[in-house]
C-alpha cells in the first residue's frame, strides 16, 4: 500500500 505509518514499516511499503 505504501503507507508505512503502521507497525510494519518494511511490510507496509510493499503492501
Swiss-Prot record:
<protein>
    <recommendedName>
        <fullName>Pregnancy-associated glycoprotein 59</fullName>
        <ecNumber>3.4.23.-</ecNumber>
    </recommendedName>
</protein>
<keyword id="KW-0064">Aspartyl protease</keyword>
<keyword id="KW-0378">Hydrolase</keyword>
<dbReference type="GO" id="GO:0006508">
    <property type="term" value="P:proteolysis"/>
</dbReference>
<keyword id="KW-0645">Protease</keyword>
<keyword id="KW-0964">Secreted</keyword>
<comment type="similarity">
    <text>Belongs to the peptidase A1 family.</text>
</comment>
<keyword id="KW-0325">Glycoprotein</keyword>
<feature type="glycosylation site" description="N-linked (GlcNAc...) asparagine">
    <location>
        <position position="4"/>
    </location>
</feature>
<dbReference type="GO" id="GO:0005576">
    <property type="term" value="C:extracellular region"/>
</dbReference>
<dbReference type="GO" id="GO:0004190">
    <property type="term" value="F:aspartic-type endopeptidase activity"/>
</dbReference>
